[in-house]
A protein has these predicted regions:
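Active-site groove signature of glycoside hydrolases
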Residues: 116-132
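Short, acidic/polar
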Residues: 37-51, 101-116, 164-165
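Residues at the N-termini of beta-strands
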Residues: 19, 58, 120-123, 152-153, ...
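Beta/alpha (TIM)-barrel catalytic core signal, keyed to glycine-rich beta->alpha loops juxtaposed to Asp/Glu
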Residues: 4-7, 129-317
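Active-site mouth loops of central-metabolism enzymes
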Residues: 28-42, 93-103, 130-132
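N-terminal binding-site loop/beta-alpha segment at the start of enzyme catalytic domains
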Residues: 1-87, 147
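A short, structured active-site edge motif that brings together acidic residues
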Residues: 85-97, 124, 182-185
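Structural motif
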Residues: 50, 54, 115-116, 149, ...
Length: 319
């Protein structure tokens, strides 16, 4: 794959990212992903190096991932490889019930910066809306973070259409653009489309970053009614659900074969790219990372996107 990838602006900011990023929730999380058991830092550093070698420049983490471990790991890898200037690095603030003042947001950002070993992050996001505190209050703190030079740009995550509009307006009053809204978005989670969020973000020139773009592994085709995922995912995706999505998996395989034997994961990621989103799949090892890279360098036809839309809607209509 060419190391020269087209770059996409994050809203009206000066940040430019590749069409595919890397989400590193798995880097440090033991509960959902089993960090430290089936994989560890020795597996993750090759993922980091291969990601940059593939020309991908966008990595997304959060203070909540592994209780800060994810931030420390990526900071360590950046320092060891002297690759900070090759990255657009994003992290997130968690508005937990005991830290609801704007000052706590700035304190949390400084703690994140200490963990990644930087004086400034590229994109700082609020991980979810916390309704007891007005969105406008949070956005004032985010604008303060930009003015203090602690972050180049700011975004939100898991915000509804109306919340996105309010965040955008509040930041605009401070002269700060809203870069992005990071939401769960995949062939098995179409709420960004059905809720009107995609249209709102398009109208406001706010980028959509798609987390869980292969539905926590469900769109890989690896899991079937006879092979249920381990851990917490077993509760989310039972045999009945896996049976229901098999026609969609079959279509992903069929379309992938028409594009040089692309995998269901690669087709799923390309579908999101065609939708104008920036997917950020995770990777616990080099094999998974290389499979993600295979979503780049080609494009689904409009007809294939429509077929996937239709099959995906069938799955959701039976939920």
């Amino acid at each position: 794959m060419s190391s020269q990838l087209d770059l996409i602006p994050l809203g009206k900011t000066d940040l430019r990212v590749t069409p595919l990023g890397l989400g590193i929730w798995q880097w440090g999380d033991t509960m959902m992903w089993g960090y430290g058991k089936g994989y560890g830092d020795a597996d993750l550093k090759p993922v980091y190096e291969a990601t940059l070698a593939a020309g991908i420049n966008f990595i997304d983490t959060a203070e909540m991932y592994g209780r800060g471990r994810s931030e420390r790991v990526v900071g360590q890898f950046m320092a060891e490889t002297a690759t900070r200037d090759q990255l657009v690095l994003a992290t997130k603030f968690a508005p937990l019930p005991w830290r609801l003042s704007p000052g706590r947001l700035l304190h949390a950002l400084r703690e994140s910066l200490n963990r990644v070993g930087l004086s400034q992050v590229d994109l700082y996001q609020i991980h979810w809306p916390y309704t007891p505190v007005a969105i406008e209050t949070w956005m004032e703190a985010m604008a303060d973070a930009v003015e203090a030079g602690l972050t180049r740009a700011v975004g939100v995550s898991n915000f509804s259409p109306s919340q996105t509009i309010r965040a955008h307006a509040a930041l605009a009053r401070r002269g700060v653009p809203l870069a992005s809204n990071q939401v769960e978005y995949s062939l098995l989670e179409r709420k960004p489309e059905t809720s009107g969020l995609v249209k709102v973000c398009r109208d406001l020139d706010v980028a959509i970053i798609a987390y869980s773009p292969i539905a926590k592994g469900m769109l890989t085709g690896k899991y079937t009614p006879a092979n249920i995922p381990p851990g917490m995912r077993r509760r989310l995706y039972n045999r009945g659900y896996l049976s229901k999505i098999q026609p969609l998996i079959d279509l992903l395989r069929e379309i992938g074969q028409a594009h040089g034997d692309k995998t269901p994961s690669q087709v799923s990621l390309n579908w999101l790219i065609c939708k104008g989103a920036v997917p950020i799949p995770g990777a616990k090892n080099l094999r998974q990372a290389r499979e993600n890279f295979g979503a780049l360098g080609w494009r689904l036809t409009d007809e294939e996107v429509a077929r996937l839309d239709e099959e995906s809607e069938k799955v959701m209509s039976h939920e």
